[in-house]
Swiss-Prot record:
Motif Di-lysine motif: positions: 308-312
InterPro entries: NAD(P)-bd_dom_sf, Sc_DH/Rdtase_CS, SDR_fam, VLCFA-Steroid_DH
Lineage of the species this protein comes from: Eukaryota, Metazoa, Chordata, Craniata, Vertebrata
GO biological process: estrogen biosynthetic process; fatty acid biosynthetic process
Domain of life of the organism encoding this protein: Eukaryota
Record CDD domains: 17beta-HSD1_like_SDR_c
UniProt source species: Bos taurus
Pathway membership, UniProt: Lipid metabolism; fatty acid biosynthesis; Steroid biosynthesis; estrogen biosynthesis
Encoding gene, per UniProt annotation: HSD17B12
Protein name (database record): Very-long-chain 3-oxoacyl-CoA reductase
Function summary: Catalyzes the second of the four reactions of the long-chain fatty acids elongation cycle. This endoplasmic reticulum-bound enzymatic process, allows the addition of two carbons to the chain of long- and very long-chain fatty acids/VLCFAs per cycle. This enzyme has a 3-ketoacyl-CoA reductase activity, reducing 3-ketoacyl-CoA to 3-hydroxyacyl-CoA, within each cycle of fatty acid elongation. Thereby, it may participate in the production of VLCFAs of different chain lengths that are involved in multiple biological processes as precursors of membrane lipids and lipid mediators.
Assigned GO CC terms: endoplasmic reticulum; endoplasmic reticulum membrane
One example GO MF annotation: very-long-chain 3-oxoacyl-CoA reductase activity
Alphabetical list of Pfam families matching this protein: adh_short
């Protein structure tokens, strides 16, 4: 009985400390949510930063919604994507709805020889906002060596998800620094916050975008340039293969309206209150438990996908 008492006391303090830690994290989340989404206001995003906003991957999903939100604020829009037909359609929709000028640049971001064309097309434009949104992922979660067409997949994911962010920033940032104002919004992913097995290459490229953004923000915030890393969880987009939005998987429009409120308030954001809460909870998990959950979740999706493909 005497030896049990110290052990009971130790367990009590371990439990109390754990509860206190979780309570502190939840309190911090509520404070942050209130500051950002309750009281916050984006840092003057509009034509005063520069007439034009450039959006890569701007014909679908999150990219299209950013283009629409920026056009709503009176900015002229440059859409950069692969399909000229889709570019023409979205460009026409935006110009008619928001009465702003639009330009389109049709390029395939899986190629590395596109940036001279983009540079020439952007020459002379007063660019206030760059949204680096273009991206690609796996067809389904898979073990690294079993990823279909692995060598080509490695090259494509790095070229589209990581190289494009560096190259586009290289083209646009000098003008922002010269004018001492501008905003670069880099769309990373929650998969870049924590390693995601079975999406290894994708997760690694998104971690690159997150680190690149954080470093760049520290380098250039004194020059008047905001660089933001946006780290969403699931959004109902074609890339995520989610057809209908839910309370935790918002539509692109809902997500972007929420994320716009974080510009100038958070340099690193999940963009959406529920996503921020999930990130806070995930950060409190021990790594062994996180990886167990991540592997189980990814492998479940993998098995269902392969079973469906076999049936077809």
């Amino acid at each position: 009985m005497e030896t049990a008492l110290p052990a009971a006391g130790f367990l009590y303090w371990v439990g109390a400390s754990t509860v206190a830690y979780l309570a502190l994290r939840i309190s911090c989340w509520f404070f942050t949510a209130l500051r950002v989404w309750g009281l916050g206001h984006e840092a003057g995003v509009g034509p005063w930063l520069g007439e034009w906003a450039v959006v890569t991957g701007g014909t679908d999903g999150i990219g299209k919604s950013y283009a629409e939100e920026l056009a709503k604020r009176g900015m002229k829009i440059v859409l950069i994507s692969r399909s000229q037909d889709k570019l023409d359609q979205v460009s026409s929709e935006i110009s008619e709805k928001f009465k702003v000028e639009t330009k389109t640049i049709a390029v395939d971001f899986t190629s590395e020889d596109i940036y001279d064309k983009i540079k020439a097309s952007l020459a002379g434009l007063n660019i206030g906002v760059l949204v680096n949104n273009v991206g690609m992922s796996y067809e389904y979660p898979e073990y690294f060596l079993d990823v279909p067409d692995l060598d080509n997949t490695i090259k494509k994911l790095i070229t589209v998800n990581a190289l494009s962010v560096c190259k586009m920033t290289r083209l646009v940032l000098p003008g922002m620094v010269e004018r001492s104002k501008g905003a670069i919004l880099n769309i990373s992913s929650a998969s870049g916050m924590y390693p995601v097995p079975l999406l290894t290459i994708y997760s690694a490229t998104k971690a690159f975008v997150d680190f690149f953004s954080q470093c760049l923000h520290e380098e250039y915030k004194s020059k008047g340039v905001i660089v933001q890393s946006v780290l969403p969880y699931y959004v109902a987009t074609k890339l995520a293969k989610i057809k209908r939005p839910t309370w935790d998987k918002p539509s692109p429009e809902t997500f972007v309206k929420s994320a716009m409120k974080t510009i100038g308030v958070q340099s690193r954001t999940n963009g959406y209150p529920i996503h921020s809460l999930v990130a806070s909870v995930s950060a409190s998990l021990p790594s062994w438990l996180y990886f167990k959950i991540a592997m189980y979740s990814g492998n479940s999706i993998r098995v269902r996908y392969l079973k469906k493909m076999k049936m077809n």
